[in-house]
UniProtKB/Swiss-Prot annotation:
Compartmental location: Cytoplasm
Transmembrane intervals: none
Subunit field text: Heterotetramer, composed of two GyrA and two GyrB chains. In the heterotetramer, GyrA contains the active site tyrosine that forms a transient covalent intermediate with DNA, while GyrB binds cofactors and catalyzes ATP hydrolysis.
Superkingdom of the source species: Bacteria
Record-stated family: Belongs to the type II topoisomerase GyrB family.
PROSITE patterns noted in UniProt: TOPOISOMERASE_II, TOPRIM
Name of the protein this chain belongs to: DNA gyrase subunit B
Key word Transcription regulation present: no
UniProt-listed Gene3D superfamilies: 3.30.230.10, 3.40.50.670, Histidine kinase-like ATPase, C-terminal domain
Summary of the function given for this chain in its UniProt record: A type II topoisomerase that negatively supercoils closed circular double-stranded (ds) DNA in an ATP-dependent manner to modulate DNA topology and maintain chromosomes in an underwound state. Negative supercoiling favors strand separation, and DNA replication, transcription, recombination and repair, all of which involve strand separation. Also able to catalyze the interconversion of other topological isomers of dsDNA rings, including catenanes and knotted rings. Type II topoisomerases break and join 2 DNA strands simultaneously in an ATP-dependent manner.
Length: 388
């Protein structure tokens, strides 16, 4: 029999490799009323496992010293350890983890009773949220445990993190697929039942539904299968229906029981759908323009004669007045001048449709020649390799 219902390590070798790569490793095991210990040097046991006392405790202490013969650097980065241990505490509600760095007399205690709901709260700190955190746990018939927490905020990015047996999957997998399917179905059903889609005359996609969403998906699977040794994508087919069914049931009930939250989420989705459509139209307009169109506009781009981007320079100047002075003093062969009027938009905080509808930003995009958007952006088409 296995010692644990579920378990997980990065490569499935755990302490064996730690032992092999350590100059010294010391084990202390508290079990069945006795204290056992064993020590290894460079992977070789120094003596058999022995009993050194009695105890009422249970657990294992592992101490190891990385080998300087193997590693060029043996100094631990406390920030990396803190990030991972905090993550583990969120994923295992009620487990208390203490991190001490005796080099600088530092101690962190991680103890989150709320589990994934506190994980979402931590990620969304400082953001304006649209709903209270939705959080549930469920057990499927095949031994798979599902836990999900989510919340929408007023940002425009999706932030979904997936875990299997406490191991992160940056490429998602079947648990993410099940989550997305249930989320989209639940929201579409709500929008149809409330007659919102007909009223607003918009078509909604899964991307619209996930704009501003922060979510954590954690599954515990007895025998998980991954796409590679590093476990960056879960491929266990039985996980998708387990997550989808649990999420569908719980999330649909949440929307019915929390009408104000559902209304806020629906408003966010409709705004995202409209913005996506406006961005598409604006992108098509920008695509139809060329640098020659802009060159013909008064007070806009004064291009250089050089056609080789590596030898061309673009100077961005504020206003037509500065633009006129710059044009008089430039080297026409290799220096282009682009005057920009008014207060430029902070594109980091602006929604995509607002950014692309800005005349000054549109002028800049067209002048640079790289295009815009995931499908069309190509840095190889940059018309100037020096931009000032």
């Amino acid at each position: 029999d296995n010692s644990y219902k579920v378990s997980g390590g990065l490569h499935g070798v755990g302490v064996s490799v730690v032992n092999a790569l350590s100059s010294k490793l010391h084990l202390t095991i508290y079990r069945a009323g006795q204290i056992h210990e064993q020590e290894y040097h460079h992977g070789d046991p120094q003596y058999p496992l022995r009993v050194i006392g009695e105890t009422d405790n249970t657990g294992t202490t592992v101490r190891f010293w990385p080998s300087a013969e193997t590693f060029s650097q043996t100094i631990f980065n406390v920030e990396i350890l803190a990030r991972r241990l905090r993550e583990l505490s969120f994923l295992n509600a009620g487990v208390r983890i203490v991190l001490r760095d005796e080099r600088i007399n530092l101690e962190h205690v991680y103890d989150y009773e709320g589990g994934l709901s506190e994980f979402v709260k931590y990620i969304n700190e400082g953001k304006n949220h649209l709903n209270e955190i939705f959080h549930f746990t469920a057990d499927a018939d095949n031994g798979i445990a599902v836990e999900v927490a989510l919340q929408w905020n007023d940002s425009y990015q999706e932030n979904v993190r997936c875990f299997t047996n406490n191991i992160p999957q940056k490429d998602g997998g079947t648990h993410l697929a099940g989550f997305r399917a249930a989320l989209t179905r639940g929201l579409n059903q709500y929008l149809e039942n409330e007659n919102i889609l007909k009223k607003e005359k918009v078509n909604v996609t899964g991307d619209d539904a996930r704009e501003g969403l922060t979510a954590i998906i954690s599954v515990k699977v007895p025998d998980p299968k991954f796409s590679s040794q590093t476990k960056e994508k879960l491929v266990s087919s039985e996980v998708k229906p387990a997550v989808e069914q649990a999420m569908n049931k719980e999330f649909s009930a949440y929307l019915l029981e929390n009408p104000q939250a559902a209304k806020s989420i629906a408003g966010k989705i409709i705004d995202a759908a409209r913005a996506r459509d406006a961005a598409r139209k604006a992108r098509e307009m920008t695509r139809r323009k060329s640098a020659l169109d802009i060159a013909g506009l008064p007070g806009k781009l004064a291009d250089c004669q050089e056609k080789d981007p590596a030898l061309s320079e673009l100077y961005l100047v504020e206003g037509d007045s500065a633009g006129g002075s710059a044009k008089q003093g430039r080297n026409r062969k290799m220096q282009a001048i682009l005057p920009l009027k008014g207060k430029i938009l902070n594109v980091e905080r602006a929604r995509f449709d607002k950014m692309i509808s800005s005349q000054e930003v549109g002028t800049l995009i067209t002048a640079l020649g790289c295009g815009i958007g995931r499908e069309e952006y190509n840095p190889d088409k940059l018309r100037y390799h020096k931009i000032i």
